[in-house]
């Protein structure tokens, strides 16, 4: 299995896989243009024969925080290590950039506990994530995802004040 940074020609495969899980709410729907614009965030896994198996993205909020996003593998690749290899590559990339806090929102926290992630009870502790994505998410008022972080929770925010994130999260209820 090969894990590598995505190339622009991978965008249609990433788009198809990510959006195949958007209908049931597992992942948020992403536009093809958005995938293309952010393709450098993605890492992909391929079989030894070059078959696309899965992807994951690492989004940078600043030198203090990044987020693992859209980590997904094809059904036939589940339990074969592709997701683990992608996640390990994303963690390594964050470490190469000197980022000590990695966050994510998920419905499968047990997978991420094995990699040093822990739950964050109050999502407003991650104001950059709230301001970048959550306030425009269609599930804002009924979010069922678990916030998790690996490393310390950042004490700085570049996108919005912590107090406003706290209000936004608590208004969502």
Annotate each PLM feature.
Residues 126-173:
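C-terminal "cap" of GNAT-fold acetyltransferases
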Residues 14, 18, 112:
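Hydrophobic pocket/interface hotspot
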Residues 10, 64, 107-108:
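A generic "binding-loop/recognition-motif" signal
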Residues 100, 106-133:
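Conserved active-site alpha-helix within GNAT-family acetyltransferase domains
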Residues 2-14:
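A short beta-loop-alpha structural element at the N-terminal edge
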Residues 73, 79-94, 104:
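Conserved acetyl-CoA-binding loop-helix of GNAT-fold acetyltransferases
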Residues 29-42, 47-48, 54-65, 69-73:
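A conserved beta-strand-loop-helix scaffold within acyl/acetyltransferase catalytic domains
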Residues 17-29:
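Helix-loop element at the rim of GNAT/NAT acetyltransferase active sites that forms part
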């Amino acid at each position: 299995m090969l894990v590598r940074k995505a190339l622009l020609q991978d965008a249609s495969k990433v788009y198809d896989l990510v959006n195949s899980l958007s209908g049931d709410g597992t992942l948020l729907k992403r536009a093809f243009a958005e995938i293309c614009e952010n393709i450098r965030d993605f890492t992909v896994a391929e079989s030894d024969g070059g078959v696309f198996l899965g992807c994951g993205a690492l989004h940078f909020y600043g030198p203090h925080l990044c987020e693992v996003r859209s980590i997904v593998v094809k059904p036939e690749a589940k339990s074969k290590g592709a997701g683990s290899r992608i996640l390990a590559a994303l963690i390594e990339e964050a470490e190469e950039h000197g980022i000590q806090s990695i966050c994510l929102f998920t419905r499968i926290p047990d997978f991420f506990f094995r990699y040093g992630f822990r739950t964050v009870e109050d999502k407003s502790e991650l104001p950059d994530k709230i301001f970048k994505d959550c306030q425009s998410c269609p599930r804002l008022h009924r979010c069922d995802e678990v916030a998790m972080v690996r490393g310390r929770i950042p004490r700085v925010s570049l996108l919005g004040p912590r107090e406003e994130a706290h209000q936004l999260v608590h208004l969502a209820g």
